[in-house]
Amino acid sequence: IASVNCSDYPKPVCSLLYMPLCGSDNKTYGNKCNFCNAVADSNGTLTLSHFGKC
């Protein structure tokens, strides 16, 4: 199962680096920072589906 370490997040500003991740909400996040901030916003209910676009 794919996983991402989000212990350093949320961060106030994310880089523009594009390395897409697909969340359990079937939404593509542009990079780990954007994904981890969304995980924080979801109180941990959002998980990683897989690396790459959904």
Swiss-Prot record:
Cellular localization per UniProt: Secreted
Keywords in alphabetical order: Disulfide bond, Glycoprotein, Protease inhibitor, Repeat, Secreted, Serine protease inhibitor
Molecular function GO terms recorded: serine-type endopeptidase inhibitor activity
Glycosylation sites: N43
Site residues (Reactive bond 3), renumbered to this chain: L16, L17
Pfam families linked to this entry: Kazal_1
SUPFAM superfamilies hit by this protein: Kazal-type serine protease inhibitors (SSF100895)
Keyword Repeat: yes
Cysteines engaged in disulfide bonds, as pairs: C6-C36, C14-C33, C22-C54
Occurrences of domain Kazal-like (ranges): 4-54
Ribosomal protein is among the record's keywords: no
GO cellular component: extracellular region
UniProt domain comment: Avian ovomucoid consists of three homologous, tandem Kazal family inhibitory domains.
Record-given protein name: Ovomucoid
